[in-house]
């Protein structure tokens, strides 16, 4: 059985990997690696950077959410599911970070704040019940999939590298949503989903610019 201290050390290490630039390592190569860099003007590059910054912060939040849930999950199987999903999300984190630097930009300075808030939400959900915790994962991944679809449509047409990253992320996120529901997650009602959408707008509006 893992002690509370062991959990704290593991989660501190995960936080450092998430928040320190270039600290995390992907297990899969970025889908953008095989594509040529497109010619983007200043406005297009700034727009692509803003969208990828939002997606990078979304992955920071996902890492924190899963970390919080894994810390308080009651069943070992649920904790393992959370940790496995977080490991897959690291690929997304690294891909988005890499793409940001390729575009001449950088991650949001607000990431530590969003990480802390997401960790507390995840830990709170896990403390209440595993069913709620898994349901929150499913609802969050549903929101992420919607954002990704919008961003893929909003990217400059010639920015194939960013679109390739978001396309693979969308595939993975949909899988994580299905996994959470199959594991017994609670399916949130539409009013709750609407509230989550409004809350997520705070993150997207701020991180697009900073």
Swiss-Prot record:
Single GO BP term: ubiquinone biosynthetic process
Keywords linked to the UniProt accession: Cell membrane, Iron, Membrane, Metal-binding, Monooxygenase, Oxidoreductase, Ubiquinone biosynthesis
Cofactor detail note: Binds 2 iron ions per subunit.
Enzyme Commission code: 1.14.99.60
Enzyme class per UniProt: oxidoreductase
Requisite cofactors: Fe cation
Molecular function terms from GO: 3-demethoxyubiquinol 3-hydroxylase activity; metal ion binding
Statement: the UniProt record of this protein carries the keyword Cell membrane: yes
Membrane topology note: Peripheral membrane protein
InterPro entries documented for this protein: COQ7_proteobact (IPR047809), Ferritin-like (IPR012347), Ferritin-like_SF (IPR009078), Ubq_synth_Coq7 (IPR011566)
Catalytic reaction(s) noted: a 5-methoxy-2-methyl-3-(all-trans-polyprenyl)benzene-1,4-diol + AH2 + O2 = a 3-demethylubiquinol + A + H2O
Localization (cell): Cell membrane
Pathway: Cofactor biosynthesis; ubiquinone biosynthesis
Pfam families: COQ7
GO CC annotation terms, alphabetical: plasma membrane
Protein's UniProt keywords contain Oxidoreductase: yes
Task performed by this protein: Catalyzes the hydroxylation of 2-nonaprenyl-3-methyl-6-methoxy-1,4-benzoquinol during ubiquinone biosynthesis.
Protein's name according to its UniProt entry: 3-demethoxyubiquinol 3-hydroxylase
């Amino acid at each position: 059985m893992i002690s509370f201290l062991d959990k704290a050390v593991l989660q501190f290490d995960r936080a450092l990997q998430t928040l320190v630039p270039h600290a995390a390592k992907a297990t899969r190569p970025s889908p953008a690696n095989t594509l040529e860099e497109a010619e983007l003007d200043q406005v297009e590059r700034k727009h692509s950077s803003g969208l990828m910054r939002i997606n990078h912060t979304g992955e920071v939040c996902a890492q924190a959410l899963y970390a919080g849930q894994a810390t308080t999950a009651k069943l070992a199987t649920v904790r393992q599911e959370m940790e496995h999903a977080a490991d897959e999300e690291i690929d997304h984190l690294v891909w988005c970070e890499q793409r940001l630097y390729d575009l001449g930009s950088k991650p949001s300075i607000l990431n530590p704040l969003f990480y802390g808030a997401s960790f507390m939400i995840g830990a709170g959900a896990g403390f209440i019940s595993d069913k709620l915790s898994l349901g929150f994962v499913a609802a969050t991944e549903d929101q992420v999939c919607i954002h990704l679809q919008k961003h893929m449509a909003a990217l400059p047409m010639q920015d194939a590298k960013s679109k390739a990253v978001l396309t693979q992320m969308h595939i993975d996120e949909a899988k994580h949503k299905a996994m959470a529901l199959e594991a017994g997650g609670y399916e949130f009602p539409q009013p709750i989903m609407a509230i989550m959408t409004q809350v997520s707008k705070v993150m997207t509006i701020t991180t697009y610019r900073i």
